[in-house]
């Protein structure tokens, strides 16, 4: 076979998706991330096994410390069946006893109703752009930009999400890079494209 023929065949091959190690390697030019990579190894952005449970977890986590959120999640998961039907059937007073605020009880029930009614369909959203998914999710009371971005990362495994709304991310960037405004952080994040979700995983590790 001639060299030109061989090259033509290669040109027609479909693009190969980068391996987890190759994706991580693109972030190593950043010294802060390189140090986190050395410490924590290869991380991956992976879809949740249970999208509804992941959405409930994100709502519980809203504006709470890691320890407080973990304690509430543990009580909630012991008290209620974490399915749309289980949350809808759960007594509001019992959910409050788990440590959920009245507003968060309303939020998890809103999400449960959206799942149960078919208003929120993960399979339908999988084909949408990040912006379209955020618009759809934030139409549900209790889901703001932060929760929607957590869904993009941990339900849909979208690889180029930068959750500047997240306090842990902002703390990590302030400590590691000295940037203090959200606009500065957004600008900084462009160096991590197209793997800003992956970069975020490492940033969280730096402040754990």
Regions found by a protein language model. Give the residues of each.
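Long, compositionally biased
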Residues: 2, 118, 122, 135-136, ...
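Short glycine-enriched nucleophile-adjacent loop
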Residues: 152
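Short pre-active-site segment immediately N-terminal to the catalytic Zn-binding motif
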Residues: 124-141
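Phosphate-backbone recognition surface of nucleic-acid-processing proteins
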Residues: 155-192
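N-terminal polyanion-binding entry modules of DNA glycosylases/AP lyases
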Residues: 1-124, 128, 187-208
């Amino acid at each position: 076979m001639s060299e030109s023929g061989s090259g033509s065949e290669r040109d027609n091959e479909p693009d190969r998706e980068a391996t987890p190690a190759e994706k991580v390697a693109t972030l190593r030019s950043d010294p802060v991330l390189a140090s986190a990579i050395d410490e924590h190894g290869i991380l991956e952005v992976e879809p949740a096994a249970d999208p509804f449970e992941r959405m409930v977890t994100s709502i519980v986590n809203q504006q709470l410390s890691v320890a407080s959120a973990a304690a509430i999640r543990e009580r909630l998961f012991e008290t209620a069946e974490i399915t749309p039907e289980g949350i809808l059937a759960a007594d509001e007073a019992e959910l409050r006893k788990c440590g959920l605020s009245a507003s968060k009880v309303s939020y998890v029930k809103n999400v449960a109703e959206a799942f149960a009614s078919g208003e929120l369909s993960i399979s339908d959203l999988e084909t949408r752009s990040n912006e379209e998914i955020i618009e759809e999710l934030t139409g549900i009371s209790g889901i703001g930009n932060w929760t929607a971005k957590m869904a993009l990362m941990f339900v849909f495994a979208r690889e180029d999400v930068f959750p500047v709304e997240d306090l842990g991310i902002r703390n990590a960037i302030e400590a590691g890079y000295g940037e203090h405004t959200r606009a500065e952080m957004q600008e900084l994040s462009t160096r991590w494209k197209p793997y800003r979700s992956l970069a975020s995983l490492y940033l969280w590790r730096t402040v754990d």
